[in-house]
Each structure stands twice: as structure tokens, then as C-alpha cells.
């Protein structure tokens, strides 16, 4: 997914990929995607390299990032997407290998600084290893910031209705740490934990301790929903809330926070470039201080 997204940007050039898969299988997985469709471009393998749209990309299969010799191919930024090297100590092996920066594609397991577009991106001060948080935090944080900046959040609960992930089981199987998580993904709505709401407190310190949440894993292949229910400090009608979110989506958060009043469903957001899209028709208000936002 990172690779496909990068192909749509002129300011990103993929020069190397490290994976334990061989190049032929990488090419196959890039060409064909059950969720996002066929790759729009040419993909082939030559002399052990992946060649995409005529550009040669170095392929390696190193288990230890320290051996990757990123400097030999002029790597500026490594997208650390294995889910294994999630601490400063382990991710720093990429720096040792010659990379200048490392972005963890999920939450870190230590105090590695976390940055989210639409939340605290402007506080980035050049750190060489950062986390981009989780997909749920990226969806929640921009919306929470707009609401808190305009109306103040006293407290809130978040529920994410989350598409299935690769760690789930196609049929019931062993899952010793999470018994429910071992049940068949295609057959069940599975309650699960998530640290996404609490993580918002790391990127928006003013909300630290004010939000928590949970997840339901559901049998859909892609696109998840965040349901944010909050109590407001400043009373506001639902129309006023919509107006504030729409203004943000057209202003400072354009390209990060989207806004729609269409009668949309989840598949309409397959391939969406915004990290969060507010569904104006889906939310409801109990009164001017208690509201559910989707």
C-alpha cells in the first residue's frame, strides 16, 4: 500500500525494498490486489531487481536492518512496516545502515515520538525516528482536534468498527492472548481492544486522559469507521459542529480531514487519500453538549 501510494507522488522515489519474499512474489503481489485492484503500471523482475514503470528497485532479504547498506542506494527515509522493529533501539539499525530518517508505520513500543497529520505535525523538530501512529489514531485525531479547538471536549468514548486484518483467523483457531481474536473473521463481529483513543492524548496532550475506546472487528476487507461520542464544554448545535468541521476540511486540514454529506457507505472510501472523512449525515446529537460523530 505504501508503494502504491508513493507511485502517485512526484516527490517520492522508491529505491529499495527489504522483505523476506523473493522478487518474483513481490511483483505478483504488487500487480494483483484483491482489495485495491490491479496495479496501474508495468511490473517485472530483472536480475533480481524489481522493475516498476521502467525503474529498477533494489531488492534484499535481510533479517537484520543493520546489514541493509541503505547508503549504497541513497535512502533518505525508511518506511519501517514489518511491525517488528518498533522501538528506537531496533529501528535505529536503519540509521546505522545509512538511512537518514525512519518512519514507523504503526505505534511504537517505547517513547518514540508520534506525529499525526492534522494533529501535531507542526511540532516535528527533525527527529530521525518517528511513529506515524495507527490508522485509527490518524482517523480520530484530526476530528478530535477540530472539536476540541472549537468547542472543548470534556470527555469522550470512541468505538472503531474495524475491517479485518491479516492477523485474524479465516476460521476458528488458537489465539492464546486474545481468545475472541481467534474466532473466524468472516463469521463474527469481534469485540477487541484498541489503544487508538488513548494515543490521541500523545499527539494532542490537551486531550490526555479524556478519551478511551474499543473496537469491533467486522467481516469487511477494507475501510473502518470511527464513532466518537463526546461531551462538549461549549454548547453547540449539530449544524454548528458540521460547519466547523467543513471549514477545517477546506482550510488548515485540507487533504487530511475530508467532509461529505452524501449517502456513502464504507466501500466508497476504498483508496481514499484523506486520513479521516467526516460523515455529516451519520452523526447525531442528544443535546447541545452531547454528540456522536462519525
From Swiss-Prot:
GO terms for cellular component: cytoplasm. PROSITE patterns: GAPDH (PS00071). The active site is at residue 135. It catalyses: D-glyceraldehyde 3-phosphate + phosphate + NAD(+) = (2R)-3-phospho-glyceroyl phosphate + NADH + H(+). Keywords: Acetylation, Cytoplasm, Glycolysis, NAD, Nucleotide-binding, Oxidoreductase. Belongs to the glyceraldehyde-3-phosphate dehydrogenase family. This is Glyceraldehyde-3-phosphate dehydrogenase. The gene is gap.
Amino acid at each position: 500500500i505504501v508503494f502504491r501510494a508513493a507511485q502517485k507522488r512526484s516527490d517520492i522515489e522508491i529505491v529499495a525494498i527489504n522483505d523476506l519474499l523473493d522478487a518474483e512474489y513481490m511483483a505478483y503481489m504488487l500487480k494483483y490486489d484483491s482489495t485495491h485492484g490491479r496495479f496501474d503500471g508495468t511490473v517485472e523482475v530483472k536480475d533480481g531487481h524489481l522493475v516498476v514503470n521502467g525503474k529498477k528497485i533494489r531488492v534484499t532479504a535481510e533479517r537484520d536492518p543493520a546489514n541493509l547498506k541503505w547508503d549504497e542506494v541513497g535512502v533518505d527515509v525508511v518506511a519501517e512496516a514489518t511491525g517488528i522493529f518498533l522501538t528506537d533501539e531496533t529501528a535505529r539499525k536503519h540509521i546505522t545502515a545509512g538511512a537518514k530518517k525512519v518512519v514507523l508505520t504503526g505505534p511504537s513500543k517505547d517513547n518514540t515520538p508520534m506525529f499525526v497529520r492534522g494533529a501535531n505535525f507542526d511540532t516535528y523538530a527533525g527527529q530521525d525516528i518517528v511513529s506515524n501512529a495507527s490508522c485509527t489514531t490518524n482517523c480520530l485525531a484530526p476530528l478530535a482536534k477540530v472539536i476540541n479547538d472549537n468547542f472543548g471536549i470534556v470527555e469522550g468514548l470512541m468505538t472503531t468498527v474495524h475491517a479485518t486484518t491479516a492477523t485474524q483467523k479465516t476460521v476458528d483457531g488458537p489465539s492464546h492472548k486474545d481468545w475472541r481474536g481467534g474466532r473466524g473473521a468472516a463469521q463474527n463481529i469481534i469485540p477487541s481492544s484498541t489503544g487508538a483513543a488513548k494515543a490521541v492524548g500523545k499527539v494532542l496532550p490537551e486531550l490526555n486522559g479524556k478519551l478511551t475506546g474499543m473496537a469491533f472487528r467486522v467481516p469487511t476487507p477494507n475501510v473502518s469507521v470511527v464513532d466518537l461520542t463526546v461531551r462538549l464544554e461549549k454548547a453547540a448545535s449539530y449544524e454548528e459542529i458540521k460547519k466547523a468541521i467543513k471549514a477545517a476540511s477546506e482550510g488548515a486540514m485540507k487533504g487530511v480531514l475530508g467532509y461529505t454529506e452524501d449517502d456513502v457507505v464504507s466501500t466508497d472510501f476504498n483508496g481514499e487519500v484523506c486520513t479521516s472523512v467526516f460523515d455529516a449525515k451519520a452523526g447525531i446529537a442528544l443535546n447541545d453538549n452531547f454528540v456522536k460523530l462519525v
